[in-house]
Structures are given as C-alpha cells and as structure tokens.
C-alpha cells in the first residue's frame, strides 16, 4: 500500500513538470507570434495592440530602443508623437532614431559633427566649382586676347607702313620740287613743320595762321606716284572737299549743294587758287635759297676756323722743336 502511494506521488510530480514545461513553451510561442515591440520587452510589460512605439521599434532591434530611451526617454517620445499628425510621425521618429544613433557613436559631437562635415563638403565643392569656372574663363579669354593683340599689331604695322610711305613720297615730292625749281615751306618765325598726311581732316583754329603748301590728293598718294594737281573745274571739287583746311579759308570755296550741285564763282576761285599757288612757290623758293646760303656761309666759316687752328698748331710744334734743337 505504501509503495502504491509512493508511485502515485511520483507520477503527479512528473505530470506537474510536464505541464509547467508546456506552459513555458506556450507562453514563449505566444510572445513570439504576438510581435511585442522592443520598448515593451525592455520595460517588461505586455505589448498592447495600440502601442504607439510598436511600429518603430521591432522586437529584433533592442539596441535601437535603448539608444532612444537613453537620450529622450519613453514619455518624451510619446508626447512628441501625440502632438503630430499620422503623416508626420514616421519622419519625426526617423529623426529621433538618427539623433540617438549618432549620439551613441559620437558622444562628443553628435549631429553637429555630421553637420560640420557636410558643410565642409559643400564648401569644398563650391571652391572647386569656382576654380573650374575661372579656368574656363581664362581659356575662353585667351583666343580673344590673342585676336586683340593681332589686331593691334596689324593696326600698328599699317600705321607704320603709311608713315613710311608718306615720308618716302614726301622725299620724292621734295626732290621733284627742287628739280622743278620749287622750294619748301620755310618760315623764319617758326620751325620747319611738315604738314601731316591727315592735316586736311584736322580743324584749323582761328588764331592759327594758315600755311601755304604745295599739296597733293590722297588718291595720288595711294598710287605711289605724284603729279601736280590741275586747277580746273573738273578737279576743283576734289581739291576743295579734301584740302579745304590747307588753304586756310574754309568758307570761301565751299561746294554748293543747295541748287543741285555746282560751284559758286568757279572761275574766280580757280584764278585765286592759281595766284596763291604761284605766290607760295615763289616765297618758298626765296626762303630755301636764303637758308641754303646761310648754311653754306656757316660751313665755310667753320672750315676756315679749322684751317687756322691747324696752322697755329703746326707753328707751335715747329717752334718747340726749334727751341729744343737750339738748346741741344
């Protein structure tokens, strides 16, 4: 009888053990299938169906909730979510989780370190963009600068060629004038001034005295030749329009376009031009002869002084040599 009671008691204990194991397994399976959030597991409480933190803290990521709980706390997170709409809650929780994650990795700087790093990257990209734009501007301006330099060089070369051609033609004209018995424009009161090629384009002031010169047209200069301009009615228009300032009288021989073209007092103007030209040539010839005579006299005086000095030096040397020989 006692043995039967002992066996029955052992069976009851085993049955209780089996029931306890089954209950533990059941509770484990029930908790796993229900998907309790990491917040509820961390707080060791039952996860309700309307848990506000369940969508953002899954059960398999307990470290995520620990970081948020350490930085903000459960009550602070719940208060933040209660003030937001349903559409804003995911974005707010994303920022909270990110801040707690960065603070866990960088306890000193936190999100400020990430922000400064991003700002440095933006600044570096902007500086690189500025450098690229400056290089592009430099490369784009190089052909333009080269073209401007070539244009300036061509312009200076053209001016130099025009000046050399003008000087050469002026020398040819001077030689031809001397051959023809004409003189240059010499003024005793002023220095010898050569009339520039574009003098007809420059205005003559009222105080400046007009200088009479034997001029020639631009077309004749371009043809590298010279021929005295004919003072007739056909070429008078070109002479008056191109060399109006040379004769010093701008309002006297103006071309009249009011009545369909033509000249006013053509015969009188041509006659006056001829007389003025003859008088200018005669005065120039006289001045040239006077200058040449003056230069010749100066050269003769200089040669005479040099000869006298040379003779004086010879006499001095002879006397010195004669004295030395006498003493010896």
From Swiss-Prot:
GO terms for biological process: microsporogenesis; pollen development; regulation of asymmetric cell division. Residues 35-136 form the LOB domain. PROSITE patterns: LOB. It comes from the Eukaryota. GO terms for cellular component: nucleus. Belongs to the LOB domain-containing protein family. This is LOB domain-containing protein 27. It comes from Arabidopsis thaliana. The lineage of its organism: Eukaryota, Viridiplantae, Streptophyta, Embryophyta, Tracheophyta. The gene is LBD27.
């Amino acid at each position: 009888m006692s043995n039967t009671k002992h066996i029955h008691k052992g069976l009851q204990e085993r049955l209780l053990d089996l029931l306890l194991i089954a209950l533990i397994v059941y509770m484990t399976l029930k908790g796993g299938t229900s998907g309790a959030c990491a917040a509820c597991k961390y707080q060791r409480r039952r996860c309700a169906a309307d848990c506000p933190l369940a969508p953002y803290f899954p059960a398999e990521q307990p470290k995520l909730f620990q970081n948020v709980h350490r930085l903000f706390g459960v009550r602070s997170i719940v208060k933040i979510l209660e003030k937001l709409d349903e559409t804003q809650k995911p974005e707010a929780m994303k920022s909270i989780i990110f801040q707690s994650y960065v603070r866990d990795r960088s306890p000193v700087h936190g999100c400020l370190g990430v922000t400064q790093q991003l700002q440095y990257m933006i600044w570096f990209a902007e500086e690189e963009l500025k450098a690229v734009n400056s290089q592009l501007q430099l490369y784009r301006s190089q052909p333009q600068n080269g073209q401007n330099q070539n244009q300036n060089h061509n312009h200076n070369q053209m001016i130099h060629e025009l000046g050399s051609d003008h000087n050469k033609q002026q020398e040819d004209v001077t030689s031809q004038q001397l051959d023809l018995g004409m003189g240059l424009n010499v003024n005793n009161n002023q220095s010898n001034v050569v009339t520039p090629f574009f003098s007809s384009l420059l205005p003559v002031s009222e105080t400046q005295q007009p200088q009479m010169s034997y001029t020639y047209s631009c077309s004749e200069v371009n043809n590298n030749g010279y021929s005295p301009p004919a003072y007739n009615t056909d070429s008078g228009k070109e002479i008056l329009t191109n060399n109006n300032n040379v004769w010093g009288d701008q309002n006297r021989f103006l071309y009249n376009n009011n009545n369909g073209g033509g000249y006013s007092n053509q015969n009188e103007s041509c006659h006056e031009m001829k007389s003025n030209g003859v008088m200018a040539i005669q005065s120039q010839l006289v001045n040239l002869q006077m200058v040449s005579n003056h230069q010749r006299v100066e050269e003769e005086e200089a040669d005479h002084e040099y000869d006298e000095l040379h003779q004086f030096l010879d006499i001095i040397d002879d006397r010195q040599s004669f004295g030395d020989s006498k003493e010896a």
